[in-house]
From Swiss-Prot:
The keyword NAD does not apply. One of its GO terms (cellular component) is nucleolus. Residues 1-42 are annotated as: Disordered. The gene is APE1L. This is DNA-(apurinic or apyrimidinic site) endonuclease. PROSITE patterns: AP_NUCLEASE_F1_4 (PS51435). The record marks D311 as: Important for catalytic activity. One of its GO terms (molecular function) is metal ion binding. It is found in: Nucleus; Nucleus, Nucleolus. Residues 1-12, 23-39 have a biased composition (Basic and acidic residues). The active site is at Y182, D222 (proton donor/acceptor). Apurinic/apyrimidinic (AP) endonuclease involved in active DNA demethylation and gene imprinting. According to a report, also displays an in vitro 3'-phosphatase activity. According to another report, has no in vitro 3'-phosphatase activity. Catalyzes the conversion of the 3'-blocking groups 3'-phosphor-alpha,beta-unsaturated aldehyde (3'-PUA) generated by ROS1 to 3'-OH. Has a strong non-specific affinity to DNA. Redundant with APE2 and at least one functional allele is required for seed viability. Its cofactor is Mg(2+).
Amino acid sequence: MKRFFKPIEKENSPAAKKPCLSPEKRDGDGDGVEEEKNQNEPSKFMTWNANSFLLRVKNDWSQFSKFVSDFDPDVIAIQEVRMPAAGGKGKPKNHEELSDDTKVLREEKQILTRALSSPPFGNYGVWWSLADSKYAGTALLVKKCFKPRKVYFNLDKLASKHEPDGRVILAEFETFRLLNTYSPNNGWKDEENAFQRRRKWDKRIVEFLNKTSDKPLIWCGDLNVSHEEIDVSHPEFFATAKLNGYVPPNKEDCGQPGFTPSERGRFGATIKEGRLVDAYRYLHKEQEMESGFSWSGNPIGKYRGKRMRIDYFLVSEQLKDRIVSCKMHGRGIELEGFHGSDHCPVTLELSKPSSEMEQNQVSN
């Protein structure tokens, strides 16, 4: 789950040394939104499932703005924007624009626009990929001094096409690509919008990774899967979870969505085939019960205290040695640092590449 005030810039930061320009879009050659070549590249990233971006702006914007100001990310990836795409009833949708077709939607668009024009967000260019209704959707905020060369909104890298429900934003920089996804939930049953949808998604992700191996990748977002037992607070609870007593016929599909053996196995195979590194687990080998999970259940009810790590930064092996830090910024079962969402922000910081390393990454 989105520009014109003077930005707040940290002393000695790249943005402070070089003025940030507006992200002027220009039509490319039919394969995405292409931007001017920029020799500086982002190195600080943040991903967050906002669980309704509008609600976060209305209720939690001050604390989230402070978090962004303090960390000063170059790129912010948002999932579960939950704002509808522009286009009236029965008309083609513009999935890159917020809808203003009704009085309520116009007011909501104005709220988001004002929020994203205020410090520190006025320093970022914003790209949206929105669903037809207030469901799912993603956003990508990139500092204006780090303009991507191209931006796509699908796994097939086709101009103007958006994934159903706005689940993908792919930004191409000079030496790497950044993929922001809101991966579909597995659901509880072998139905078209549950198990089948997730299997198809996982298959397409592998195909995407195989087609784009010419350049290192940073894949972030809500990937809706916990890879290992260490990635959940209560493995037995999640492994035996049921919906209204229903048990899938295949034991590989049993358990909490995001923690079934089938999903976990496919996720592990995807990481291996894509030659990816889980940045957080690369640095944090042991389970951290206070701050090692990105999603937390409702503090009231059976999911109280039940937590999962389902938000990730996966990076190509070529980038492994540049990982400086990868942190989850929520703590405890009371959702401290979650900024109103049921997910907390996750951040990644890379060291600056040497000239030789940059050349090798592009050539490999």
